[in-house]
Amino acid sequence: MINTIYEIGEWPKDFTEVTMIFLKKKPQATKCSDHRTISLIARTAKILAKILRRRIEKKIWDVLGEDQFGFRRGKGTRDVIGMLRIISERTLEIDKERSVCFIDWQKAFDRVNWSKLMQILKKIGIDWRERRLISNLYMAQSVKVRLNRGETRSVKTERGVRQGCCLSQILFNLYSEYLTKEALEGLRDFKIGGQIIHTVKYADDLVLLAKEEKVLQDMIDKLIEIGRCYGMEMNVEKTN
């Protein structure tokens, strides 16, 4: 069955339908933000997604910068903290001034533009069969919510990567990589040991680095501008 789906590029309906359940983050949860959503996906769909991931991940890893630490083998939050600490120490040794901004994208994983994502996958050389499968998966995807009184009707989604799918991590990393590259292209302001370093990333968390506050503000403005072209909105309250 997996081989047939792969050859024709069409996913069965039960593979593309996701059931969402809500778990309380705290006992007295009254708002939507007080709950955590969990996606229930068909087991066979997960198997096919894992096969698909193995076929495309090498080309994606090859284009990701060394500044991305999220969802990568052998890398984690400790590496991010260590890198930021080294940058801070080296900067203090050679310069008195530096500017840093911690960027937070609003619901980043839910805002990925599918058309833009497909263009990027084609650009890095992902085979048309894999692109077709990914595109058809998203185009056919529907979501229903499971509540105490039953389940809601299924509704189509129009953007975003799938929660709980192993493809989502690498697809988002790739999407984020192209967004930041386009926004900060040509920037040569901040160097450590002769190497240009202006971002540190962990999945959707982004740190911008600059020597001067004015340059940093220009980077933020450009990131907001290009981010909107990618369907992203900066969370002003959490960006600092």
What are the language-model segments listed below?
Residues 1-175:
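Conserved pre-catalytic core of RNA-dependent polymerases
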Residues 43-44, 195, 211-212:
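Structured loop/turn residues at secondary-structure junctions
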Residues 55-68, 171-205:
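Active-site palm subdomain of RNA-directed nucleic acid polymerases
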Residues 108-124, 161, 199-230:
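Catalytic palm subdomain of template-directed nucleic-acid polymerases
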Residues 176, 219, 232-234:
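Methionine-biased hydrophobic packing positions in alpha-helices, especially
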Residues 234-240:
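Short, conserved micro-motifs composed of acidic
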